[in-house]
Structure formats: structure tokens, C-alpha cells
Amino acid sequence: MLAELDFDNIPNLKYIDEQFLDPDYDPGGKHSVPYTWGVVGLFYNTDYIEEEITGWDALWNVDYAGKILMFDNPRDAFAIAQFRLGQSVNTLDLADWEAAADLLKVQKPILQAYVMDQIFDKMESGEAWIAPYYAGDAAILVENSDSIEFVVPEEGTNFFVDAICIPVTSSHKREAEEYINFLCDPEIAGANMDYVGYSTPETAAKEYMDEEVVESPIHYPSEEVLANTQVFVNLPEDVSKRIDTLWAEVKMGGPGESAVLVAIIVGFLAVYVAIILYKRHKRKRELA
């Protein structure tokens, strides 16, 4: 449970841009303060991929088979398929989720791996050529490599906000609120953004940031790009459970392939048991 914040202790909230103050995940903004934000995009190695990448369909390109990485978490992975299909990432229609799962199953044979933080090592070394990831982290890789490019796919993408909250059980709530207030100071927010790589929800902080960062389309995408984003919301339990089941099927190869695997295991065990029983029976005859 999260504590309701006392904003008398957070006067610097006034520097947070208005568009961040009434989020879907915290109506009225009573329990959280926006800390950073970003989008999801694709980064790719131009040493191996010469054509310009513009859309999520690149993650299904057989020319890159064995060199494609994919998110190892269901919400982000499904979202990519949903953007390709023109769906809402918050759809309540189970048929939509099943269609997205089918698309992910089509992709699986050409993937190198489902990964998260390992993306950095694999992309830097050239072991992988293309991968989706969060813009703030991707920017670091782009800055450190002349051959890595980043793009926000034209079909749209996820917009996310990291927020600061205080547990209702906190015994130092006032001190925590004062710390949040410190982080909301524009100069501190600007320095923090330069360090962590994720965009600050404070326009006033840009005055204290490197000009290259402020003008970077990775850190601060255009209004046109931002208008084509969607924000995740919590889904009903029945939908969440179905997503978990579908994700397991995607990772395991689908219900049909899972059934084959189970049949093979059962067959192996049957043969093993038969051999054991035969040996026991043979030993009894020899002793007799």
C-alpha cells in the first residue's frame, strides 16, 4: 500500500509539467510524483543492417535470423506484436491477445534469444544486430558506438513513467517527502537526467542539461512521435492470467509443441520403467 503524499513538504512539485500530474496509474496524483519518463524503440547495428529501419516488422525479418533479440517479459513483448497488428496494448478482448501471441510464435524461430539487460553486451559485441529496448538505456549504447542507431517505430510505441512513492508503513514519511522535493528541484532533476539517461518530466530542468541531450530525439522525441504512443494500464485478473498462459505457450513453442514434448518425456519414462522391471525380473530368474 502507498501513502498519500503531503504536498506541503513537496513545494517543488510546481516544476513538474502539468501533463504528468494526473496519470492513469494514480488518478489525481495523490500517491506518486513523476521521476523520469521514456519510450520504447528499436536499436540496430548499421555494420550489419544497411537499410534504414522504420517499423516493428524488422523484428520479423528473416534476413536477420539468429541475430534478433526480444524482450523477455510478456507486457513489452506483446505490445510490440500489438502495435504491428494495430491493437490497443490495453485491449480486453482475449482474441486480440491470442492474435498477438500467434504473431510472437511466428517470430520465435528466427530469434537469437529472449533477454533484458543482456541486450547491451550482445549488441555492443555484434553478437546481435537488432533489439527493442527503453530509450534512456538505448541512448547510452548509441553514444558509445558509431554503428548503433535508434528509432521509434512508425506503428507507435509504449510511453512509460517511473514515479516515486512512499510505502504506507514508512516511519520517515516526512524525510522521504523532503527527498522527493529535493529531486524535483530543476537543477537536481537536470543533473539526474544527465546521469541516468531518462527524460525528466520538468521542462524547467532543461536549462541545466547538456544541449545535446535536450535536442536528442532519443531523450525527447517529437510531439508527432509522442502522439502515437500508448501507456500501459493494469488489466483485469482474467486478462492477466490469459496473458501469462499465452506467454508460456510462446516461450515453450505453443500448446501443440508442448504436448509433443510431454509425450516424448512420458515415452522415455515408460521405456525406462520397462527396462528396470525387465532387469528385476531377469535377476529373480537367475536367483531361482
Name each model-derived stretch.
Residues 1-127:
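Extracytoplasmic ligand-binding site segments that recognize negatively charged/polar headgroups
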Residues 97-106, 144-168:
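Periplasmic-binding protein-like
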Residues 1-4, 26-29, 140-152, 212-217:
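Ligand-binding "clamshell"
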Residues 124, 130-147:
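A ligand-binding cleft/hinge motif common to bilobed small-molecule-binding domains
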Residues 56, 119-122, 138, 176, ...:
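Short, hydrophobic alpha-helical packing/hinge segments within bilobed ligand-binding/sensory domains
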Residues 223-288:
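Conserved C-terminal helix/tail region of periplasmic/extracytoplasmic solute-binding proteins
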Residues 167-227:
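Mature extracytoplasmic/periplasmic domains
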Residues 42, 159, 185:
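Binding-cleft/active-site segments that stabilize strongly anionic ligands or cofactors
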